[in-house]
Swiss-Prot record:
Record protein name field: Small ribosomal subunit biogenesis GTPase RsgA
Residues where Phosphothreonine is found: T166
Record SUPFAM superfamilies: Nucleic acid-binding proteins, P-loop containing nucleoside triphosphate hydrolases
Positions with a binding annotation for Zn(2+): C252, C257, H259, C265
Pfam families found in the cross-reference section: RsgA_GTPase, RsgA_N
Length: 298
């Protein structure tokens, strides 16, 4: 039976991109009753086996094992996430970026940081601050790009990342995710709204999750991570989602060190020595407190 990937889910129909070589055929499929019975919901991003009824319609027969699964947005088998943050309007926030990075890392998704609206910076201090932060994150090992959707050349280095990958765009509302995607692939024609001056953040303009062909891969312009809570991350797992902390933690005296009040902690020493940025450690402590204070689930 043929195989494919769900690229859109709408009103009980699943649109499957046929995975045959050089095929761009999309089949409209319904799920089998067995999925409902077993409480399995097909998701955008699922690799599936389907049975074709004709050239345009069919039935989902099997859902392959997922490498990861996001709840909000409901999508799975994501290879990478482009985290879009604006330099200004709204202001750049390392705390919010680190929160997104933790959630992405926890799902084994490769993050790419994109700071947009560089053309809207009006003073040198802000420019210098953004450049310094970009260098900090590059030193951790992240790909960081400074862009403007009006400057096509600033986007050129991002485009090769999309080849043969399933990519999610995420980030603060109002930072220009749709504008950025439209600049990369003008044929998408995604809706963009002006930023809401009153709220200081943009209105969500994306209605549903859909994987769209662009630059040799599949890209989802999602409503973003509408939930930024650490509901599935445990205390001992948090450090692994900070690559810079993870690297230093191997030198801690005690196994299971949470880098809070433990003696001979290599992470705290690295902060003191300037090898680990204070703001990164502060965010780690803030997130750890949040996880510790989380109400138990039964």
């Amino acid at each position: 039976m043929p195989e494919g990937k769900i690229i859109k889910a709408l009103s009980g129909f699943y649109y499957v991109l046929d995975e045959s070589e050089d095929s761009d055929k999309v089949i409209q499929c319904r799920g089998r009753g067995i999925f409902r019975k077993n409480k399995i919901t097909p998701l955008v991003g699922d690799y599936v086996v389907y049975q074709a009824e004709n050239d345009k319609e069919g039935y989902l027969m099997e859902i392959k094992e997922r490498t990861n699964e996001l709840i909000r947005p409901p999508i799975c088998n994501v290879d990478q996430a482009v985290l879009v943050f604006s330099a200004v309007q709204p202001s750049f926030s390392t705390a919010l970026l680190d929160r997104f990075l933790v959630l992405v890392e926890a799902n084994d998704i490769q993050p790419i940081i994109c700071i947009t609206k560089m053309d809207l910076i009006e003073d040198q201090d802000t420019e210098d601050t953004i450049q310094a932060y970009a260098e900090d994150y590059r030193n951790i090992g992240y790909d960081v790009y400074l862009t403007s959707s009006k400057d096509q050349d600033s986007l050129a280095d991002i485009i090769p990342h999309f080849q043969d990958k399933t990519t999610v765009f995420a980030g603060q509302s109002g930072v220009g995710k749709s504008s950025l995607l439209n600049a990369i692939s003008p044929e998408l024609g995604l809706r963009t709204n002006e930023i809401s001056e009153h709220l200081g953040r943009g209105k969500h303009t994306t209605r549903h999750v859909e994987l769209i062909h662009t630059s040799g891969g599949l890209v989802a312009d999602t409503p973003g991570f509408s939930s930024l809570e650490f509901t599935d991350i445990e205390e001992e797992e948090l450090g692994y989602t900070f690559p810079d902390i993870r690297e230093k933690s191997s030198s801690c005296k005690f196994r299971g060190c949470l880098h809070l009040k433990e003696p001979k902690c290599a992470v705290k020493q690295a902060v003191e020595d300037g090898e680990l940025k204070q703001y990164r450690y502060d965010h780690y402590v803030e997130f750890m407190t949040e996880i510790k204070d989380r109400k138990p689930r039964y």
